[in-house]
Amino acid sequence: MNEEYIKVRGAKEHNLKNINVDIPRNKFVVITGLSGSGKSSLAFDTIYAEGQRRYVESLSSYARQFLHLQNKPNVESISGLSPAIAIDQKTTSKNPRSTVGTITEIYDYLRLLYARVGIPYSPVTGLPIHSQTVAEMVDIINELPKGTKVYLLAPIVRGHKGEFRREIINLKKQGFQKLIVNGEVCEIDDLPKLDKNKKHNIEVIVDRIVLDENLGNRLADSLESSLNLADGITYLEIVELPQAVKSQFKKNQRITFSEKYSCPVSGFHLTEIEPRIFSFNSPFGACPKCEGIGKEFFFDRDLIVQDQRISIKDGAIVPWGSTSSKFILETLKALADHYKFSIEVPFISLSQNVKDILFEGSGEEEIKFEFHDGSKTQIIKQPFAGIIPSLQEKDRTIESVLIKEELAKFKSEHKCTACSGFRLKDEALCVKIANLHIGEVAGMSIAALQKWFSHLEEKLNQKQLFIAKRILKEINERLKFLMNVGLDYLTLSREAGTLSGGESQRIRLASQIGSGLSGVLYVLDEPSIGLHQRDNTRLIATLKRLRDLGNTVLVVEHDEETMYEADHIIDIGPGAGIHGGRVIAEGNAEKIKHFEESITGRYLSGRQTIKVPSETRVGHDNRAIELLGAVSNNLDNVDIKIPLGTFTAITGVSGSGKSSLMIHTLYKAALKHLEPTSKVFPGKYRELKGLEYIDKIIDINQSPIGRTPRSNPATYTGAFTHIRDWFVELPESKARGYKVGRFSFNVKGGRCEACQGDGLIKIEMHFLPDVYVKCDICNGHRYNRETLEIKYKGKSIADILMMTVEDAMQFFDKIPLIYEKLITLNEVGLGYIKIGQSATTLSGGEAQRVKLAKELSRRSTGKTLYILDEPTTGLHIDDIKKLLKVLHKLVDMGNTVLVIEHNLDVIKTADYIIDVGPEGGDKGGKIVVCGTPADIAACKESHTGRYLKQYLV
């Protein structure tokens, strides 16, 4: 293909205003602009979608039936288009079997490496295990002194129950005369009857030999016969040694030989060492107990009794309710009488012994139970089974899916006790390279793994090195790519479902570089998300390398450093939604600076900035929340103090422990304290102080606000409740007798029943993601014809749901209840989204800001602690300015705002900063420095401080 440009003509997808743009091929191109300006509409919904559609159309009709054919984007023409690959943030696998190792294929190479050069060790003795040929066995036997009398034994039964009549009859037919049964030599004709309920060991005496030089082939032939009888294993038993000869061997000593892999002492053996035994997704390798998941689920005492402050009688034992069942109440009363405790006191005041009996049962101790049924009284003496064994029995025997789901609420997740969380069978975990099994290697961080592999060649012998050379090359290259995109702190065993969108995207980016493709159009969505400024340079170098392979790299991005390094920038705007959709500026960063209409250009040139506050807040009378001794994940016994009434930023390189500290420990521990029934499990810590100063803790994260098309910003913020109430009060509604439910799309009455108020019909694609198509009965309007006849200012309720937040604000400007809900959405920079936009189409950043808007619209107590994890995701610097205004407004109302953030424009406005590090993974988990932005900038050990310094000038 010789075209110099990808030429887009007449693009009108979503809010794009018939734009024409030439994108230079084989270059690193950034598309930027405000959130909602149309960047993704151009990059993903137009250019990538058309590239994908053309590819699918080129396939046979048979192949096309398995693929979702995209609709043609609303564009007149696109020429110069290459095969397109999208690397976005929405395709993270939630399958617990998908890990960093499997996604990057490093684990596949590891399996091959262990299968080819790994050495098996007996888990019993720790001795190395080798397979042997018959010739090798003969050589070992010939090392015994001449004149030694030996038996060659075929172990046909090893520790199994049974009478084994059929096996003995078969041996008789083959001409064998003597057996060793449970250590005793027996004639096959005089064999005593075996107890079928006891375990037995039976060995066939295949040959009795006195070793000398004239044996010829007898030894080899006998060995082959013995190996055939016992599935590749044979024993050599030394019966008698020559008296005159001193030897290392002893009388009655047994030597184990195996054509397979067998331990000479314990008898532990492997049938094969192939890549499949190292796969936790294969029945040949997966741990039989957890089936390769690495986790088990047990009934948890803390979930069974969620609030120890209430009594058993009042419902402390959650699965048994408030003991409303007469049978349960009488059982517990009998138990209380027997062990002398009360069911009317708080559960926490019961002795540990009583708690243990309640949970695990009374063992063999019998309790007198009296059950009253009307006029009858039944007395039973029996042990008490215990809450947990009772729940286990119910879980095992019940077939109802609903009851099983209900029981699952009382279980917590733990490492598998059989495989210690390594997911594999013992046979796989006994194979080692440089004293480490594959599970231990997969559990190392990428940085540690790279270091281990760099020294591995020194630990391999010549034969191993020759076999492993190509495998090691592939592994080292992939590790280098992961290092280059700032993921050195991840482990290969990390589940894909636990990765952030940015991490997942960068893993797939590293995989693409490893594939070495050229002539491809790569479309990326903010790859810098979640990346510390220190690692950004390496990411940009990776993107350039992708370009240098002969590819076009098209990146939707807001990061200034990325823009300065790009070959070409396309600025979409000037505003968001209907105010965007035009190409405002094109060229490199220096050219963009001079376009007056470009908001991006104004910030690049410094004409517009986010100012550093003239002073920082010190908080409420030195009140603070103190978390002491946090040790979750990589945290190293961390102590922190968060001043209340401040805007506090948690900083540090990726993987340093910020989320472990703030989300997994502080947030969950505080929530458990404030709401004891909440199903959260905080990371380990010693003490949490200062919670008496707050009444709420809210994690405003990027999880979806809903999982169906019925969820939308209007319903989530509560604006839709007021809109429905307003429509009910309209004269036409009153005349028809319509109630509030008429305008709900969640209940029958006014909604379209064909789509049940979704506006879309879900088509299940079985092994592909479900597809939603517009309902052809209501044409996507959600309501039936009669409901749509009710109008306010000429607009039906469906028309209102199609309005943007800005339009709806103007429409309802005289109705305070609705207007106040909508204005908060506008304040967080979401004026461009439709109030009825499906929750499933909102980005993580948009969902987070909808949640923030909901919090803003609530009456503030001034005692709330808000936690936000990377709230700048997906935001242009001008949107960040609006967001900061909102967050500081929350603090001015007396609340405390805690943000985990890498964006230096946010960090510089903080009152207080806690910098975690100094590195990621095992080299992180410590507090590097705490204080004001100036304090952080002055700290030489802080990576954040080094970059923050230039922002404080």
Swiss-Prot record:
Database matches in SUPFAM superfamilies: P-loop containing nucleoside triphosphate hydrolases (SSF52540)
Entry binding sites for ATP: 33-40, 652-659
GO biological process, one term: nucleotide-excision repair
Segments forming domain ABC transporter: 320-599, 619-949
Subcellular location: Cytoplasm
Record-level GO cellular component terms: cytoplasm; excinuclease repair complex
Annotated zinc fingers (C4-type), start-end: 752-778
Isomerase in keyword set: no
Residues making up the signal peptide according to the UniProt record: none
Transmembrane regions listed in the UniProt entry: none
Record-linked Gene3D superfamilies: ABC transporter ATPase domain-like, ABC transporter ATPase like domain, ATP-grasp fold, A domain, P-loop containing nucleotide triphosphate hydrolases
UniProt xrefs under PROSITE patterns: ABC_TRANSPORTER_1, ABC_TRANSPORTER_2
Coiled coil region boundaries: none
Keywords: ATP-binding, Cytoplasm, DNA damage, DNA excision, DNA repair, DNA-binding, Excision nuclease, Metal-binding, Nucleotide-binding, Repeat, SOS response, Zinc, Zinc-finger
Molecular function in Gene Ontology: ATP binding; ATP hydrolysis activity; DNA binding; excinuclease ABC activity; zinc ion binding
Function text: The UvrABC repair system catalyzes the recognition and processing of DNA lesions. UvrA is an ATPase and a DNA-binding protein. A damage recognition complex composed of 2 UvrA and 2 UvrB subunits scans DNA for abnormalities. When the presence of a lesion has been verified by UvrB, the UvrA molecules dissociate.
Oligomer status and interactors: Forms a heterotetramer with UvrB during the search for lesions.
Assigned protein family: Belongs to the ABC transporter superfamily. UvrA family.
UniProt xrefs under HAMAP family: UvrA (MF_00205)
Protein name: UvrABC system protein A
